[in-house]
């Protein structure tokens, strides 16, 4: 059987689905799952089918209230991944020039390539606080550039891009007729800083996000794209080719979440606050890791000073039943990503075991 060259696989997603699971999983980037029994819903109140054509009206209204954006700018989609697909497909034609941050979430690259984009990269360097360099981005822009792709909070570092910098990036893009896509799936984990979507900053900014990562609500598959009204209209029509209509039961559960949101938000914030302190204590104790103090987000991206990350990951899995995400999936093989959204006891023991593996590879030089 011959496959088209447009058939693209995701190396990271395959690893995450087949290799990440472990007793002490520090690879997962989201908050631990919220339980169905804790939602104020009854089975007999749910329906299997409903009038969900271009948005179920009660859910569209709830999303608009939740996001502080007009309904006509919001497209409900199946998670952030499909939202990213729709946003890119709305903007890009095959052969269009796309600038994507490095390091980044691998599916952003794969999706742009699948859609036929000519992907080029700009750097977010640790010495610059993982922020985009506006001067570098300006040099990289071409008259044919159609899209700049960012994550905020940054995946994998959790760095937050200030609004002023996002406005400057949008202005640069607008000078060549380009748009900016900001993946905000982790932004709500900047609780104390008052997370607000970049969609409010400029008409050429498209935003994607979901309830998955920060709130432990992956099973709802509630994602969204925010764009200008014309981009939203095109995304709804494009989604007729992919999603057609969503699962109505999931829509009803999502509405229950959004109308009873405070305890869900508070649970996530409490967990991440406690776990962040554990992570910072661990990082402070390790001279073999280079990482700034963690202030927000669900992940950190330390650099290993000695040895190899692959040896560390292999030792951690083989001897300690634990996992972190190798930096090779972010094109930075000297780094690895730690997730802190797991139960506090799991994080504490996982970090303890990570420390043991760091000690072991430091002594052996990376040998098994």
Feature locations, PLM:
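N-terminal small-domain helix-loop-helix segment of the aminotransferase-like
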Residues: 2-86, 259, 361, 368
């Amino acid at each position: 059987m011959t496959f088209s060259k447009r058939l693209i696989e995701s190396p990271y997603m395959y690893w995450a689905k087949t290799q990440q699971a472990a007793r002490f999983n520090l690879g997962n980037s989201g908050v631990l799952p919220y339980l169905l029994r804790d939602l104020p819903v009854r089975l007999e109140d749910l329906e299997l089918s409903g009038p969900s054509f271009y948005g179920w009206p009660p859910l569209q209204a709830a999303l608009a209230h939740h996001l502080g954006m007009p309904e006509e700018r919001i497209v409900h989609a199946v998670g952030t991944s499909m939202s990213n697909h729709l946003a890119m497909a709305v903007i890009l034609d095959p052969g269009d020039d796309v600038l994507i941050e490095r390091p980044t979430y691998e599916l952003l690259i794969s999706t742009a390539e699948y859609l036929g984009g000519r992907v080029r990269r700009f750097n977010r360097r640790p010495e610059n606080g993982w922020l985009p360099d506006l001067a570098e981005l300006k040099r990289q822009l071409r008259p044919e550039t159609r899209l700049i792709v960012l994550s905020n909070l940054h995946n994998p570092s959790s760095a937050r891009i200030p609004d002023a910098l996002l406005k400057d990036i949008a202005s640069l893009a607008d000078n060549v007729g380009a748009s900016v896509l900001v993946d905000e799936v982790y932004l709500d984990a900047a609780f104390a800083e008052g997370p607000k979507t970049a969609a409010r900053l400029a008409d050429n900014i498209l935003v994607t996000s979901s309830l998955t990562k920060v709130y432990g609500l992956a099973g709802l598959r509630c994602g969204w794209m925010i764009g200008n009204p014309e981009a939203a209209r095109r995304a709804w029509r494009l989604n007729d080719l992919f999603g057609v209509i969503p699962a109505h039961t999931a829509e009803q559960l999502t509405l229950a979440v959004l109308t009873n949101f405070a305890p869900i938000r508070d649970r996530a914030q409490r967990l991440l606050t406690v776990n962040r302190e554990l992570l910072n204590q661990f990082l402070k104790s390790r001279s073999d890791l280079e990482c700034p103090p963690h202030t927000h987000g669900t992940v950190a991206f330390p650099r290993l000073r000695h040895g190899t990350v692959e040896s560390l990951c292999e030792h951690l899995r083989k001897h300690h039943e634990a996992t972190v995400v190798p930096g090779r999936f972010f094109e930075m093989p000297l780094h690895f990503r730690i997730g802190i959204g797991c139960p506090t006891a799991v994080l504490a023991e996982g970090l303890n075991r990570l420390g043991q593996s760091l000690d072991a590879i430091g002594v052996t030089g990376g040998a098994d």
